[in-house]
Structures are given as structure tokens and as C-alpha cells.
A protein has these predicted regions:
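Individual alpha-helical transmembrane segments in multi-pass integral membrane proteins
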Residues: 123-219
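Beta-strand-rich ligand-recognition modules
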Residues: 53, 57-93, 99-110
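Exposed low-complexity, polar/acidic, P/S/T/G-rich flexible segments that act as propeptides
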Residues: 103-131
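Conserved small/polar residues in nucleotide/adenosyl-binding loops
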Residues: 1-3, 7-16, 217-220
């Protein structure tokens, strides 16, 4: 699917219908780099979901991600990419190719954004401050509850439910951090982030199951 210029809005429309990407499907975006940008260290921010990414400026490949992992049938991961742009690239044409590596990966694409590299993490924190604060709070609260429950379990029974509440809090917090890409602040690779996201979904469900299991067997 080829689309001229940056996408307007958030939905990817092909022939007036919304298209969900399948494995191997490609979207090609065409646009041009603004001629009069004033950034000292410009980058183009492009988010992807389980996709291979290729970026070319005036036909020259300047950035690629995930192609080797996709060829080896490995998890590619999801997250933000920051492609460096030279000041001499102003006004040049840019082509962005996004290749889905899984079925039903996404049905919308956020428009690429030209920005100053030094503002990347500040904007990331401002835009996602509520999820980030929630994630950190849940992780710290859960870890504290698990530690207290672990100590109390040595002296008395019936504290396992409290332990699993803490475990659920940690898993929800970690999943939130991964889902909102807080982990990219620490340069954690995208495949690792996505793997942690999946693992914590499973661990969260396990924590809920263990809580009700303890509730069942400790009920009078």
C-alpha cells in the first residue's frame, strides 16, 4: 500500500476502508523533509508495531531495523525509532517502508514527526507522564507488599494472598511500562521490551489465579 505524504489523522485508509495489516504486508509512506527546520540535531520519530522499518532519503537507505530478525523468524518488537537527519537533507524526499511481521499487527499509523533529539525524552515523559507515574508506583507498591508478605509468611499463615496482590501490582506496573515504552528511556532493546510485555500478561493472570486459589483454600 503506497501513501503519498504523511498520514493525516491516525487511521490508515486504503480505498476508503480501514485495513488491518497481515504478516508480510507493507505500507510505503512518501513525504519530504521540511526545508526550513531549525533543529540543531534533528531526528524523525517513527513508531512501529511488530514491523520491519526501512527509511530512505532521496533513494539512499539511511536507516533499517528488524530485517535480520524477521528473516530468522525472531520477534522484532514494537516501539519508537529515532532516525537522524542531516541539515543538508532539508527539502529532500523521504520514503518510509513498514513491513508487518505478524498477522493483525495494526490498523493505524501515527504520522512521522521531525523533532529535536535533545527534546525526545522530555516529550516522551510529558506525553506519557500519567502511565509512567502509575507504572513506577505500581511496581514499587507491589514490591513492598511482596517483601512484607514474604517476611510475615515466615511467622504466620494466610499471608500468601497479600503476596499475590503485590505480585499482580508488579506485573501490571511492568506491563504498563513496557506498553508505553518507558523502557526505551533505559535503552532496552525493542524485542526485550515486547517479550517482557507478553510475559507480564501471563504472570498477571497467574497472580490472579493464585490469589483466588489461596482464597479458596483458606476460606472457612
Amino acid at each position: 500500500y503506497e501513501i503519498s505524504a504523511c498520514l493525516v489523522g491516525s487511521e490508515m485508509c486504503i480505498r476508503d476502508s480501514t485495513k488491518t495489516m497481515g504478516k508480510g504486508d507493507k505500507v510505503v509512506l512518501y513525504t519530504s523533509i521540511p526545508k526550513n527546520f531549525k533543529y540543531d540535531t534533528p531526528v524523525i520519530k517513527i513508531p512501529t508495531t511488530s514491523s520491519v522499518l526501512k527509511v530512505s532519503v532521496n533513494g539512499k537507505l539511511v536507516y533499517t531495523y528488524g530485517e535480520d530478525r524477521y528473516a530468522e523468524n525472531k520477534l522484532v518488537g514494537s516501539g519508537w525509532h529515532y532516525i537522524p537527519v542531516k541539515k543538508t537533507d532539508a527539502g529532500k524526499n523521504i520514503r518510509i517502508i513498514i513491513t508487518s511481521t505478524e498477522d493483525a499487527t495494526f490498523s493505524s499509523i501515527d504520522a512521522p514527526v521531525l523533532m529535536e533529539y535533545s527534546d525526545v525524552f522530555q516529550q516522551m515523559m510529558i506525553k506519557n507522564r500519567v502511565p509512567y507515574v502509575s507504572a513506577v508506583s505500581l511496581i514499587l507498591f507491589g514490591a513492598l507488599i511482596m517483601a512484607l508478605a514474604g517476611i510475615m509468611m515466615i511467622k504466620r499463615t494466610g499471608m500468601s494472598r497479600l503476596f499475590w496482590i503485590g505480585a499482580l501490582s508488579v506485573t501490571v506496573g511492568t506491563w504498563t511500562a513496557c506498553n508505553y515504552r518507558l523502557t526505551q528511556l533505559f535503552n532496552i532493546p525493542l524485542p526485550v521490551t515486547t517479550t517482557l510485555e507478553y510475559i507480564n500478561l501471563v504472570l498477571g493472570a497467574l497472580s490472579v489465579a493464585m490469589y483466588f486459589n489461596c482464597l479458596l483454600y483458606t476460606s472457612p
